[in-house]
């Protein structure tokens, strides 16, 4: 089917950026939010963003004006979706809220409209249960900020029509994004599945008293990272990684719920930059990070082994192909390389030994070597020769 009209539901950080991308791509867009103040703020932010694009030469002044003319704003769901070919849900990451939006949108949209969710973690098959036509529901996971990040993960639910996946991927390309098609639905998809294991690791480093946030962030920067993990948690909001781990503790493994430090900080409303305090003091608008030597209690190999383990899980579960896992991690995390290319330079034995050490040290099954690595088949997995496990998560 041909996509001409796009409705974006939710005018927050993700929604307004997604609307901008579609408008610049030549689509007629309606941005919907039930809160008028959110729509007013979104309009200002889109105009400012397009002005920056003009200044950087990404679009001409005329192209920016044309894009703005293609965006309409409404607080009425019916007005937004009644003539839409594609509806993109971009409301906050709550199962109940997203299911409510998908139910209403699918009831009011044309029968053949594609209903896409921008969820970052929630299984599409779970969300699609709320829709009138589950076969028209697909995951379309943009990364933040969508105007800068090129990756879009395209996720089929158990009932999704293959043509819906294909059309969603084609539309992603037309707005200048790089779509990665998952082979099947799985919690947190690719990039965030790998990020979640890293997040759990950094929480447990604090739980075990191994190092402090400044020491770990100093270590991260010594390894060439622009921002350490705790500064990043503060910057995006500590509730974001915690919500992800909380969902995965229910959908994938209770082990993700071991992130007690993140949970406590969310309970105490110490969310980072947006509340003024998290792992660091943000009262001046930027993190006040004490200068300390890097910790030597963790290593780059710890993180590489964890990433490789999660990548191999995705492959053996039949969620994604090795090349797509690599590309998703590189594009989704702005990294110079991904776990597949790293694994090619390491032996199965050294990765297995490191994972066994981490699983014991942190008393965490997430870090235990996955089946393929335990059986010495890491190379088969990363080179695409591994048959997916029949009983893997879906």
Q: Model-derived features: where do they sit?
A:
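N-terminal glycine-rich phosphate-binding loop for ADP-containing cofactors
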Residues: 1-394
């Amino acid at each position: 089917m041909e996509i001409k009209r796009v409705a974006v539901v939710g005018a927050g950080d993700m929604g307004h950026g997604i609307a901008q991308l579609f408008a610049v791509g030549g689509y007629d867009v309606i941005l919907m939010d039930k809160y008028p103040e959110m729509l007013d703020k979104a309009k200002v932010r889109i105009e400012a963003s397009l002005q920056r694009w003009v200044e950087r030469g990404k679009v001409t002044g005329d192209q920016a004006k044309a894009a703005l003319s293609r965006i309409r704003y409404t607080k009425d769901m019916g007005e937004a979706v009644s003539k839409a070919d594609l509806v993109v849900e971009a409301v906050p990451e709550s199962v109940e809220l997203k299911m409510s939006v998908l139910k209403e949108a699918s009831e009011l949209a044309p029968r053949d409209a594609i209903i896409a969710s921008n969820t970052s973690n929630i299984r599409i098959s779970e969300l699609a249960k709320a829709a009138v036509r589950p076969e028209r529901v697909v995951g379309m996971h943009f990364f933040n900020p969508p105007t800068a990040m090129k990756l879009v993960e395209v996720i089929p639910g158990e009932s999704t029509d293959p043509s819906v996946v294909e059309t969603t991927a084609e539309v992603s390309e037309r707005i200048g994004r790089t779509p990665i098609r998952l082979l099947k639905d799985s919690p947190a998809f690719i990039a965030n599945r790998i990020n979640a294991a890293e997040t759990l690791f950094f929480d447990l480093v604090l739980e075990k008293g191994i190092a402090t946030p400044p020491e770990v962030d100093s270590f991260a920067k010594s390894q060439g990272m622009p921002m350490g993990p705790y500064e990043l948690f503060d910057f995006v909001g500590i509730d974001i990684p915690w919500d992800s781990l909380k969902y995965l503790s229910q959908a994938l493994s209770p082990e993700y719920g071991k992130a007690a430090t993140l949970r406590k900080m969310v309970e105490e409303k110490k969310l980072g930059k947006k509340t003024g305090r998290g792992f660091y003091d943000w009262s001046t608008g930027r993190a006040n990070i004490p200068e300390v030597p890097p910790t030597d209690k963790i290593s780059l190999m710890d993180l590489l082994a964890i990433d490789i383990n999660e990548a191999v899980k995705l492959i053996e579960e039949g969620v994604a192909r090795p090349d797509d896992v690599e590309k998703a991690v590189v594009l989704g995390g702005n990294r110079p390389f991904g776990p597949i290319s790293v694994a090619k330079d390491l032996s199965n034995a050294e990765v297995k030994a490191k994972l066994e050490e981490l699983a014991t040290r942190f008393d965490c099954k997430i870090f235990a070597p996955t089946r393929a690595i335990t059986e010495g088949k890491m190379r088969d997995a990363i080179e695409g020769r591994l048959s997916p496990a029949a009983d893997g998560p879906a």
